[in-house]
């Protein structure tokens, strides 16, 4: 399964956004009301929601990983609740990174499961309760902000600094999952990732609403294997340009790029095409950790292709060194107040 946001969503509003405005009004009315009026069920564990305002990539996965690591460093045992985009499980499933494939559980849960227990289920309460039975004492909800299926003690909304919220319109006229004003009412803090001024509008809105604003960067974690080499970089993620920039930040020369749809399921012809293109120009092949997870668990992918494929992973670093710990403390404090209130 793959999804791809129309390119016009990320530009200034044009005739297409205008033509879709009536449908967007209806969608926004329904999604906004559901978000504002919902009273999500609660679990007896602290819950941090890592979400975003729009469809498409903003940096939720590295953010969730950063908080899982931070919780572990503080002596907690975090568990992650996910819907498992792109997978085909309809019930409750504990992700096993040693046996599960991306086609069954999704690429993001496989990455997250390297750092903490991940439970997949459309019923997020059931998933959280199952993680509690395994000994988890802190829940990270990967996405799920708009669905309101599990109460979050703290909702951190992630936005990309360069893309922001695109044209600011609601689906299908733009990338917003619900009207920004409605989403902001339920937001506890904003996390702006990267450099750029594309998120200036949403930052101003968050400031006016009195929401804390944090800043962070995605740092390449494997620069040594990338620097000084010429690459054909390819990615099937929500914001591939962010990945290409990360390769450059790591010291690599990006000669060619090839972008696929988000969560793209690669076919043998895709692999042959990438290999041929790289061979003709004398380039190395490099991709994201998410894409590598999908490729590595796909049947029929040549082992020699995987062995030569470079993977650039990234870590999230807050600009303020105390930010991550402060958010974790706030989640726990709010949970305790809820429990004893």
Curated annotation (Swiss-Prot):
Pathway membership, UniProt:
Glycolipid biosynthesis; lipid IV(A) biosynthesis; lipid IV(A) from (3R)-3-hydroxytetradecanoyl-[acyl-carrier-protein] and UDP-N-acetyl-alpha-D-glucosamine: step 6/6
Species of origin: Brucella melitensis biotype 2 (strain ATCC 23457)
Q: Which residues form a coiled coil?
A: none
Q: Where is the signal peptide?
A: none
First-tier enzyme category under EC? transferase
Q: What is its EC number?
A: 2.7.1.130
- Under what name is this protein listed? Tetraacyldisaccharide 4'-kinase
According to UniProt, the reaction catalysed is: a lipid A disaccharide + ATP = a lipid IVA + ADP + H(+)
> Which Gene Ontology molecular function entries are recorded, alphabetically?
ATP binding; tetraacyldisaccharide 4'-kinase activity
Q: What does this protein do?
A: Transfers the gamma-phosphate of ATP to the 4'-position of a tetraacyldisaccharide 1-phosphate intermediate (termed DS-1-P) to form tetraacyldisaccharide 1,4'-bis-phosphate (lipid IVA).
Q: Which NCBIfam families match?
A: lpxK
Q: Which PANTHER family match?
A: TETRAACYLDISACCHARIDE 4'-KINASE, TETRAACYLDISACCHARIDE 4'-KINASE, MITOCHONDRIAL-RELATED
Among HAMAP family, the record links this protein to: LpxK
Whether Lipid metabolism counts among this entry's keywords is yes
- Where, by residue number, does ATP bind? 54-61
- Give any single GO term for biological process: lipopolysaccharide core region biosynthetic process
The record's keywords, sorted A to Z, are: ATP-binding, Kinase, Lipid A biosynthesis, Lipid biosynthesis, Lipid metabolism, Nucleotide-binding, Transferase
What would be one Gene Ontology cellular-component term for the protein? plasma membrane
* Annotated family: Belongs to the LpxK family.
Q: In the record, what lineage is assigned to the organism producing the protein?
A: Bacteria, Pseudomonadati, Pseudomonadota, Alphaproteobacteria, Hyphomicrobiales
